[in-house]
């Protein structure tokens, strides 16, 4: 049996996000990851404003299994998200596969949407399939 599914990648999703927004914060593990995300965002929207943050130490804290609440305090995300709000960032993109570990805790700090690109990609794929079946 053959399925007609589109081929999609996280990098394509960054391009979609670039079109949908004017100002994003991107949290990545390191500068290489951030550069890849930024390049794809800017391909889609050269006028996009991006506030990039690299946090390899966050990856290490997550890998130790430290509780989410402790991580939020250790990295003072309350202050970071206060800054995001004050500069009118529209959404925060989790540009590392480790970071969804603290997503629920981050969502409690602010009303700024937190985008897990993996979930965003699945939602886009589901939407595409529903459109084809209509």
Whereabouts are the PLM-identified features?
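Non-catalytic structural scaffold of enzyme domains
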Residues: 1-134
């Amino acid at each position: 049996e053959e399925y007609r599914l589109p081929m999609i990648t996280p990098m394509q999703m960054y391009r979609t996000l670039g079109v949908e927004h004017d100002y994003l914060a991107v949290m990545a593990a390191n500068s290489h990851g951030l550069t890849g995300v930024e390049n794809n965002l800017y391909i889609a929207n050269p006028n996009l404003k991006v506030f990039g943050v690299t946090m390899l130490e966050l990856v290490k804290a997550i890998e130790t299994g430290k509780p989410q609440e402790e991580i939020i305090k250790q990295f003072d995300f309350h202050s970071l998200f206060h800054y995001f709000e004050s500069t009118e960032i529209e959404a925060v993109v989790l540009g590392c596969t480790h970071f969804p570990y603290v997503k629920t805790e981050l969502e409690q700090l602010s009303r700024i949407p937190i985008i897990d690109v993996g979930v965003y990609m699945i939602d886009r794929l589901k939407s595409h399939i529903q459109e084809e079946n209509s």
